[in-house]
């Protein structure tokens, strides 16, 4: 049994090295290709117990390529935890703006179901199916209102890194698919297929610091296929 535990620990260390090298390689490629974003997220757990969780979040997202835009957002979400399953519901609000785009507000109520399955050596397979209702309100004259629904499916792994300290690291690679028929004309990135890699540091006080990179393949009304690269930093307390 001890030899088996040592074996899986070595495997996880090799996997971590591979994921870090992959992250560096993709990041280097991103600077010279397509569109580049960053996103900052601050998350607060308003309530948490064995069955329920309530979370508030503020975020900022920025596209650097022209025509560039910025987006401020706030969201609230609740979760009902049931062993390996969790049910979620929430409401996100966003304001996207810049001088050279159609500025707009977005309200996004959503619901989701998540399933976690332990595999081996504390590695967990995580799947989430999410449906969003997106309501857009533009500022320019004449003002317009558009809305549609979007389905999202994400699958990924939570890979804990062995550590003697109370604080720890988790590596989270994942894929996500977005499905929609008729996007709004001013919404550029409604259909996507994403690959992401996130590193999560959990401190002794249960706060978490997250770093992530996502490669996005998306489709819009004006181009068949484009690529985006998102760098993410988040803090949860």
Write out the residue ranges for each language-model feature.
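Outer-envelope beta-barrel architecture signal
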Residues: 34-36, 50-54, 83-87, 121-127, ...
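Short glycine/proline- and aromatic-enriched beta-strand/turn motifs that initiate or cap beta-hairpins
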Residues: 31-73
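Outer-membrane beta-barrel transmembrane domain signature
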Residues: 122-124, 128-217, 237
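Bacterial Sec-dependent N-terminal signal peptides
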Residues: 1-38, 237
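Transmembrane beta-strands of outer-membrane beta-barrel pores
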Residues: 44-46, 58-64, 80-84, 91-97, ...
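Hydrophobic/aromatic-rich structural module bridging two neighboring secondary-structure elements via a short loop
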Residues: 68-121
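Residues that define the transmembrane beta-barrel architecture of outer-membrane proteins
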Residues: 32-38, 70-72, 105-109, 145-153, ...
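Residues on the lipid-exposed face of transmembrane beta-strands in outer-membrane beta-barrel proteins
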Residues: 40-44, 76-80, 111-115, 131, ...
């Amino acid at each position: 049994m001890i030899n088996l535990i040592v074996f899986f620990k070595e495997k996880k260390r090799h996997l971590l090295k591979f994921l870090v090298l992959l992250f560096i390689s993709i990041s280097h490629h991103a600077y010279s290709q397509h569109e580049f974003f960053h996103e900052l997220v601050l998350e607060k757990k308003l309530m948490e117990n064995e069955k329920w969780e309530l979370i508030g979040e503020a975020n900022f997202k920025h596209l650097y390529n022209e025509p560039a835009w910025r987006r401020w957002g706030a969201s609230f979400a609740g979760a009902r935890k049931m062993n390996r399953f969790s049910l979620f519901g929430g409401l996100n609000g966003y304001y996207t703006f810049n001088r050279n785009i159609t500025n707009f507000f977005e309200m996004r109520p959503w619901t989701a179901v998540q399933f976690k399955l332990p595999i081996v050596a504390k590695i967990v397979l995580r799947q989430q199916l999410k449906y969003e209702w997106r309501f857009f309100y533009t500022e320019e004259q004449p003002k317009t209102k558009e809305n549609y629904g979007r389905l999202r499916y994400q699958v990924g792994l939570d890979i804990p890194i062995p550590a003697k300290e109370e604080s720890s690291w988790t590596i989270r690679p994942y894929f996500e698919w977005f499905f929609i028929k008729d996007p709004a004309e001013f919404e550029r990135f409604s259909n996507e297929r994403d690959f992401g890699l996130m590193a999560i540091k959990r401190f002794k006080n249960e706060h978490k610091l997250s770093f992530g990179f996502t490669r996005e393949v998306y489709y819009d009304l004006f181009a068949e296929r484009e690529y985006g690269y998102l760098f993410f930093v988040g803090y949860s307390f």
